[in-house]
């Protein structure tokens, strides 16, 4: 017998440049309806939407090169939006208010899940952040891999070939 989790409680990100990243993340979290719980010169912790995002500066002896999503550790994080319009609103905010580097603007990603729609951008340290909307039940609904009559688990994801990075 397993346990049915209730989402992700929080994610903690360690950044090289807290002077730029802490305000970036605090503003983004506030736009996403979260509230600041902890704030100091190198840390911000925002909660809401059934999760928390904690961003803190790396200790001086642990700062390193730029973030790279293919190194061991975090690849990217993704916030689930309630509508395509919310994804579009986040896009406008990160471009016009945060000046974020957009990896891809809102686009269809139905190769990942039925109706998948997403935006991908980077924080000042290069950490990749996605905001997506998947209507209905996604993979568990009609037309989904795990829904009624679905094909079941895949060995690739959305044509990305997510089999592992070792060659």
PLM-predicted stretches and their roles:
Residues 12-59:
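Core segments of cupin and vicinal oxygen chelate
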Residues 63-86:
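Helix-adjacent hinge/juxtasegments
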Residues 15-20, 78-124:
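Vicinal oxygen chelate
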Residues 1-22, 77, 135-167:
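N-terminal beta-strand motif that seeds the catalytic metal site of vicinal oxygen chelate
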Residues 5-7, 70-73, 113:
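Short glycine-enriched loop/turn motifs at secondary-structure junctions
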Residues 122-138:
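Short, contiguous alpha-helical
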Residues 59-65, 139:
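A short, acidic/glycine-rich surface segment
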